[in-house]
Design a protein with these regions (language model features):
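Post-Walker A helix-loop "phosphate-sensing" segment adjacent to the P-loop in P-loop NTPases
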Residues: 63-76, 88-89
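Short glycine-rich substrate-engagement loop in P-loop NTPases that contacts/grips substrate
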Residues: 81-110
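Loop/turn-to-beta-strand initiation segments
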Residues: 43, 78-80, 111-118, 142-150, ...
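Short regulatory helix/loop adjacent to the ATP-binding pocket of P-loop NTPases
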Residues: 130-131, 140, 154-170
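Walker A/P-loop nucleotide-binding motif
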Residues: 28, 39-61
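N-terminal pre-P-loop "Q-motif" helix
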Residues: 2-6, 21-33
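Conserved C-terminal "switch" segment of AAA+ ATPases
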Residues: 72-73, 159-162, 166, 173-219
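Pre-Walker A (Motif I) flank of P-loop NTPase domains
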Residues: 19-20, 30-33, 39-45, 114
Length: 219
């Protein structure tokens, strides 16, 4: 509870409540995330990919695996908390209040005894909040006081390397490519029952195949 709930979302709790679609495919990337998180050092995965490649779905899948106990023992009681830069900055135009919020968040993570892993869906935005909050986050990560999962695009990764090389060394990049046509079809098949139930419709296999084909062509 407390400050982490105020500025973040507990993905592990949401997963336990069945908030996320079933996860299909991407086993190699998920395994790689688990391997990185299980390390003693260099244990902060950075999911690098363009928007829409499924990076957030991977983090939700990880939260689901933690919630259902399908992870190595050292990750069994972890909580993944999404920390959004926009939520943190909202209403804190002055530098002082923003720094206080970041300090409170980082203190709460430290006080969790390693149980909380922050998910930073917009890492580059955090690092752009210079002069305090961004630097505090960078320092906490650089000293290994806080664990994090993060997400960025290839362009943002280059920016992070240029502007914060010490911080970028704390992250292990995992490339997330768009799903293949076969993977995309499997993903749609996985979420089809939920859509059918929610909208009271029946979705045929040819409709799914057409959706994949047209997405490849136009999206």
């Amino acid at each position: 509870g407390g400050v982490l709930e105020e500025y973040g979302r507990d993905l592990t709790r949401l997963a336990a409540q069945g908030a996320f679609d079933p996860f299909v495919g991407r086993e190699a990337e998920l395994r790689r995330m688990l391997q990185v998180l299980a390390r003693r050092e260099e244990n902060n995965p950075l999911l690098v990919g363009e928007s829409g490649t499924g990076r957030t779905a991977l983090v939700e899948a990880l939260a689901s695996k933690i919630a259902s106990g399908e992870v190595p023992e050292m990750l069994a009681d972890r909580r993944i908390i999404t920390l959004d830069a926009g939520e943190l900055v909202a209403g804190a135009r002055l530098r002082g209040p923003l720094e206080e919020r970041m300090r409170a968040v980082l203190d709460a993570v430290r006080d969790s005894g390693g149980r909380v892993i922050l998910f930073l869906p917009n890492l580059a935005n955090f690092l752009r909040t210079k002069g305090g909050a961004g630097d505090m986050l960078a320092n906490a990560l650089s000293h290994g006081e806080v664990r994090a999962l993060a997400r960025c695009t290839p362009d943002e990764l280059r920016e992070i390397h240029d502007d914060a090389s010490a911080l970028s060394r704390r992250f292990v990049s995992i490339q997330i490519d768009p799903p293949t046509s076969e993977e995309a079809l499997a993903i749609l098949q996985g979420i089809k029952p939920r859509f059918e139930e929610a909208h009271g419709v029946s979705i045929s296999e040819p409709a799914l195949e057409s959706a994949v084909k047209f997405a490849r062509r136009y999206v």
